[in-house]
């Protein structure tokens, strides 16, 4: 119940603290006042430190009132939790300069993930070396030139991801197994007067249809790729500020 706050306060046994053990509980209160809260002056802590006194509960009840704790001595767990919260606040206040620059791990991970998700955001597009490198890659990969070098770079990245990765190359190198085609089911529409020529014409027509389908697929892919580039506010300054 108290482990996280005890850990934050560097308590020696945060996982094993037993508030129901009277001796351990009283020692804990003394430690909390001496090391973290420090509400009393050192010379005024004698009664609280005398944990074996039969009057200790009375002194502890007075202590709760002095620190303005809203809970009574009978509400032990609630009082402990409140005192721990007070100690944490005081600890942070004493060490504000130490903790102010700390960033939670989950926030660091989120920031890193955002940077990794869009690595083009922080590039200096006006750097001459950057422009020369992009132009060299575009020429090498035969990519159409564009006034915006960031647009060209994104086009290069898309091409590399889709065509030049290990998986893409392996897929392209796979031998495609053809399917048997019944030529008699495909009507030619004219007759050459020669059965062999008719069959050759049917084959040429089927090959032409296949080429047209592949061309249409490539055109569709190109349209999607271009739309992804020009519709991205990060690469099209007309659609918004860079990085937004």
UniProtKB/Swiss-Prot annotation:
Q: What is this protein called?
A: RNA transcription, translation and transport factor protein
Which PANTHER family does UniProt cross-reference here? CLE (PTHR15924)
Q: Does the keyword Lipoprotein feature in the UniProt annotation?
A: no
Which domain of life does this protein belong to?
Answer: Eukaryota
Which keywords fit this entry according to its UniProt record?
Acetylation, Cytoplasm, Cytoskeleton, Nucleus, RNA-binding, Transcription, Transcription regulation
Family that this chain belongs to: Belongs to the RTRAF family.
Q: Name one Pfam family in it.
A: RLL
Quaternary data: Homodimer. Interacts with FAM98A (via N- and C-terminus). Interacts with NIN; which may prevent phosphorylation of NIN. Interacts with POLR2A. Component of a tRNA-splicing ligase complex.
Biological process (GO), any one: tRNA splicing, via endonucleolytic cleavage and ligation
Task: Please list every transmembrane segment annotated in the UniProt record, as residue ranges.
Answer: none
Single GO MF descriptor: RNA binding
List cellular component terms (GO). Answer: centrosome; cytoplasm; cytosol; mitotic spindle; nucleoplasm; nucleus; perinuclear region of cytoplasm; tRNA-splicing ligase complex
Summarizing the function annotation, the protein's role is: RNA-binding protein involved in modulation of mRNA transcription by Polymerase II. Component of the tRNA-splicing ligase complex and is required for tRNA ligation. May be required for RNA transport.
Origin organism is: Mus musculus (Mouse)
Classification from the root reads: Eukaryota, Metazoa, Chordata, Craniata, Vertebrata
* Residue numbers carrying N6-acetyllysine: 20, 62, 98
Q: Where in the cell is it found?
A: Nucleus; Cytoplasm, Cytosol; Cytoplasm, Perinuclear region; Cytoplasm, Cytoskeleton, Microtubule organizing center, Centrosome
- Name the InterPro entries on file: RTRAF (IPR019265)
């Amino acid at each position: 119940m108290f482990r996280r706050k005890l850990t934050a306060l560097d308590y020696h046994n945060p996982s094993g603290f037993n508030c129901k053990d009277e001796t351990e509980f009283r020692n804990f209160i003394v430690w909390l006042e001496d090391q973290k809260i420090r509400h009393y002056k050192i010379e005024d802590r004698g009664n609280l430190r005398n944990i074996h006194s039969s009057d200790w509960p009375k002194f502890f009840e007075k202590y709760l009132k002095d620190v303005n704790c809203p809970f009574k001595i009978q509400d032990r767990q609630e009082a402990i939790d409140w005192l721990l919260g007070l100690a944490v606040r005081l600890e942070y206040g004493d060490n504000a300069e130490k903790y102010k620059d700390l960033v939670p791990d989950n926030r660091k991970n989120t920031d890193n993930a955002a940077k990794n998700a869009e690595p083009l955001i922080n590039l200096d597009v006006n750097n001459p070396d950057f422009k020369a490198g992009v132009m060299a890659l575009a020429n090498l990969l035969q990519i159409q030139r564009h006034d915006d070098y960031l647009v060209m770079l994104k086009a290069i990245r898309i091409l590399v991801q889709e065509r030049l990765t290990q998986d893409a190359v392996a897929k392209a190198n796979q031998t495609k197994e053809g399917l048997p085609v019944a030529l008699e089911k495909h009507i030619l529409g004219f007759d050459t007067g020669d059965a062999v020529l008719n069959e050759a014409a049917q084959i040429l027509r089927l090959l032409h249809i296949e080429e047209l389908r592949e061309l249409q697929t490539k055109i569709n892919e190109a349209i999607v790729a271009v739309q992804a580039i020009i519709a991205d506010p990060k690469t099209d300054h007309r659609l918004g500020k860079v990085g937004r």
